[in-house]
Amino acid sequence: MDNEIVALCGFFVAIALVLSCISIITHLKNYKKPVLQRSVVRILMMIVIYSSVSFLSVYNEKIGSIFEPFREIYEAFALYCFFCLLIDYLGGERAAVISLHGHLPRPRLWPLNYLQDDIDLSDPYTFLSIKRGILQYTWLKPFLVIAVLLTKVTGVYDREDQPVYASADLWIGLVYNISITLSLYSLTTFWVCLHEELAPFRPFPKFLSVKAIIFASYWQQTVLSITNWLGLLNGTGWIYSLLNQNVLMCLEMPFFALSHWYAFRIEDYDTPTWLSCARLPLLKAFKDVIGLKDVWCDSLQTLHGDRYVYQNFEPGENLIPSRNDGRINRTSHGLRYSQGGQSKYWISRYDQSRVRLINNSQNSPQSNKSYFSIPGMSTSHFENGLQFEIDDEMEPLYNQAKQMRYGDYNYPVLLVNNTHASSSYT
């Protein structure tokens, strides 16, 4: 690579690194909302990693090839962090699902709107499928990177003496395209379904800034590969040196850094009216950002899906789903309504495998019932609450606490997903 091109890339990368590092340090020094800012800083670090690896590839291709797998993996990780940020803005997964309870389902995005019914994210199983659609790219990307490295080491990645359909490059690229398309489609579906709830948190510039860098990296590489295959980039001179994926990424990084600075500005998290809000020390905040225990636990829960059941995502209010299929699904999982829908309770279910065995052996209509009542636990028990003696001394304190906004004005509750704090807590 020409020295002039290397110097130009270094200048643009230096600007991007300065902007990103200032933004990251500012967040770490004002780490007042760890649940939100953890994901924000992780997203901002994508600029640092992209800029550094792209410049190393321009400066020395062999050195850059060593760090390129980390850049590819972090791209998928940043997409996961953005999804977590949207969830945390809404107060967590349960709050996000409950916020859509009773709302009409949304039409699916093209082209699945012609093939499937409208999507109802108030159903925890539908939410789980969307989340898995987003995270599968994060899970799959490390294996794709390993596959590329192994095929390059063994010399079968893009051999010229083999047909195109037998090329490892073709099949790895096909799996990659399907995976990232599914992930971006699922993320867009989630954003469209909850755009009204996310509106106070300025989701569009955040969504655009994260998606832009991924799209730029992907489509530029695709276009350059096609033009190179057609023999259009076989010339010499500085113009052909500029038409390089890593060179283009270096030149674009300052603009991506500015977009991330605006989208994830510190003013959304550093609220001056929060006089009693503490923050973590700088090193502790950085340690919290680079820790991956939360990612590991969330990935295991999403992969297993055991906690994504109707009982865990049913609102406390007596709201009935807007569509019949939503009520049928909850009823089939043990939810029962009483008093004309004014109250509800859950009953246990038989093991469905046993139900099928009973049906086959007895062939009785009564065996089709897949639910039973728990002995000693009648409907009135669920409706009337727990049976215990009321303490005459404690009850007035509970009644006074219920009249306060947060239970106790000496210890105000600060919601991490509220970007505009009130100046008064009482």
Curated annotation (Swiss-Prot):
Outcome of mutating F388A, per the record? Results in a 4-fold decrease in the affinity with atg8
Q: Which residue ranges run through the membrane?
A: 39-59, 73-93, 133-153, 172-192, 223-243
List where this protein forms a coiled coil: none
Q: Has keyword Membrane?
A: yes
Q: Where in the cell is it found?
A: Vacuole membrane
| Protein's UniProt keywords contain Transmembrane helix | yes
Instruction: Keywords in alphabetical order, please.
Output: Membrane, Phosphoprotein, Transmembrane, Transmembrane helix, Vacuole
Q: What would changing E395A do, according to UniProt?
A: Moderately reduces the interaction with ATG8
Q: What happens when the gene is disrupted?
A: Abolishes the vacuolar membrane localization of atg8.
Source organism superkingdom: Eukaryota
Name a GO CC annotation attached to this entry: membrane
GO function terms (MF aspect) = transmembrane transporter activity
At what positions is Phosphoserine found?
S364
Self-association state and partner proteins as the record states: Interacts with atg8.
Similarity comment: Belongs to the TMEM184 family.
This chain's function reads:
Vacuole membrane protein that recruits ATG8 to facilitate the degradation of vacuolar integral membrane proteins during early-stationary vacuole turnover (EVT) when cells enter stationary phase.
Put simply, this protein is called: Vacuole membrane protein hfl11
The organism is Schizosaccharomyces pombe (strain 972 / ATCC 24843) (Fission yeast)
User: Coding gene?
Assistant: hfl1
